[in-house]
């Protein structure tokens, strides 16, 4: 992902304030609520029968934290996202058979959750930088698909 120095600074500065546990669970939960067909990848997570059940589900929260941990790692390797996410791309493609379009959906949901959490601090410039990053991460995660 090509970011200007200003964009990179905006992304890393805001990310330093992100509560990965909270935002990860909320982002994954919102994905599962807004795009219910994505729930099929999470059969083992138990009750996903309502928005309240999804948002309160400890397995959703735990996996959301894990997802955002990987995203954090990607922020440290913006110049090599494909390499950083190669194993996760392979896993999601070959073993889990996740539609790569879902990575874009999750990225967009993450941007919405960040905007919700940070309000005025999430300026149009910060949003534009994050849109570049989530698009780059989605592209890297889709890289191993054939």
Swiss-Prot record:
Residues 2-146 form the Globin domain. Heterotetramer of two alpha chains and two beta chains. One of its GO terms (biological process) is hydrogen peroxide catabolic process. Belongs to the globin family. InterPro entries: Globin, Globin-like_sf, Globin/Proto, Hemoglobin_b, Hemoglobin_oxygen_transport. SUPFAM superfamilies: Globin-like (SSF46458). GO terms for molecular function: haptoglobin binding; heme binding; hemoglobin alpha binding; metal ion binding; organic acid binding; oxygen binding; oxygen carrier activity; peroxidase activity. Keywords: Acetylation, Heme, Iron, Metal-binding, Oxygen transport, Phosphoprotein, S-nitrosylation, Transport. The modification N-acetylvaline is found at residue 1. One of its GO terms (cellular component) is hemoglobin complex. Coiled coil: none annotated. The modification S-nitrosocysteine is found at residue 93. Involved in oxygen transport from the lung to the various peripheral tissues. The modification Phosphoserine is found at residue 44. The modification N6-acetyllysine is found at residues 59, 82, 144. The modification Phosphothreonine is found at residue 12. Red blood cells. This is Hemoglobin subunit beta. The keyword Iron applies. Heme b binds at residues 63, 92. The gene is HBB.
């Amino acid at each position: 992902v090509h970011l200007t120095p200003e964009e990179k600074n905006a992304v890393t500065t805001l990310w330093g304030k992100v509560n990965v546990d909270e935002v990860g669970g909320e982002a994954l939960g919102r994905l599962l609520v807004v795009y219910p067909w994505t729930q099929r990848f999470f059969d083992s997570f138990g009750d996903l029968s309502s928005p309240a059940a999804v948002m309160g589900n400890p397995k959703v929260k735990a996996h959301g934290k894990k997802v955002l941990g990987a995203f954090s790692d990607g922020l440290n390797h913006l110049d090599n996202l494909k390499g950083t996410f190669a194993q996760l791309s392979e896993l999601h493609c070959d073993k889990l058979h996740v539609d790569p379009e879902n990575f874009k959906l999750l990225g967009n949901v993450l941007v919405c959750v960040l905007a919700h959490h940070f309000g005025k601090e999430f300026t149009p410039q910060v949003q534009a930088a994050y849109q570049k990053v989530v698009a780059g991460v989605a592209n890297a995660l889709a890289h191993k698909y054939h």
